[in-house]
A protein has these predicted regions:
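Short, basic/aromatic beta-hairpin or loop at an interaction surface
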Residues: 50-61
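Generic beta-strand structural signal
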Residues: 14-15, 45, 90
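Structural recognition of beta-strand segments within beta-rich domains
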Residues: 20-23, 51, 80
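Buried hydrophobic-core signal for structured, non-transmembrane domains
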Residues: 41-43
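Short, conserved secondary-structure segments in the cores of folded domains
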Residues: 11, 17, 32, 51-53, ...
């Protein structure tokens, strides 16, 4: 669920397989922000785990204030991409 950012606040996105996140209109989750790369990150379902992977973005991806490359998401984790903050719910 997006909890802050320029738009889509309150919008949720189910993770079914792989969810692409970025500025490009080809992503499942589109974040319109100059700090967001065109292909910024993806969330992948592996078994019972959701894995957040930064796709070598220009400005990085943070989970709970820590910059990550790959991270197993837990309920209530806060994901920051550009000026957008999302909260992971399982």
């Amino acid at each position: 669920t997006i909890i802050s950012g320029a738009e889509n606040v309150g919008k949720s996105f189910p993770v079914d397989g792989t969810v692409s996140v970025g500025r490009s209109h080809t992503n499942k989750v589109i974040l319109k922000d100059s700090k967001v790369s065109r292909q910024h990150a993806e969330i992948t379902l592996r078994g019972n785990e959701c894995i957040l992977i930064d796709l070598n973005s220009s400005n990085g991806t943070q989970v709970n204030g820590q910059k990550i490359h790959e991270h197993i998401l837990s309920p209530n984790d806060e994901i920051q991409i550009g000026d957008f903050v999302m909260q992971f719910q399982k």
